[in-house]
């Protein structure tokens, strides 16, 4: 009630149609409108579709109107770019802070808030609200694109007898490309990339545009999750009864216990469906996988 700044940092789970579910964001906005006692800056940290700030503003204003209150407030988009497994380090030393606001008052307050963590001025990036909301989706879609692109290159290399790792070194040494997110593998997973890529394609479609490249990124990733299983089938045959395979690493990312959309789930289920037995281990995620994602496997 006495805060100058209130953060909305809740989940936006993916709906059945691929869209982001805003019920938790708007529930918090409603609560803020019911309880605020003075001018407030409302900061949306959640990954939300473009235009969500307008819905948050309308929700808060409705509650204030019902209270017959003329309190002022500003809605700010401040997408988070924390990496799972390194959240504290990323928060303490962010590589950039993106602020979306049309209010000079809110912009200055946010600068003051982040100054101890972001003393280099060019790391504080201010823009309009919709652009800030889009920036989060664009960043995740770009990283997902790099992953799918490199997996495509690796698959082509295998057909041609080229070494994908050597190709990775060759292209990564180009400063315009760099080495981040160009390691061939079993595809991306986790709570962000799959959800955000789907949401962005849906947002585009709802606004009359077909995002062909981003759609292809998702299609490539879906196929890549089964590449390892397909290699095993090619080597051992369609029926894997009597075979036991060891899986080292289960989470979508090392050092975490996050099994959401982890490629290992798809590989294991495909092998088991063909009669194989699995012995799997992950120093962080074994318990999570067994309890919630691989029951009965």
Question: What residue spans do the PLM features occupy?
Answer:
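Structural/interface elements that position substrates and couple domains in central-metabolism enzymes
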Residues: 1-297
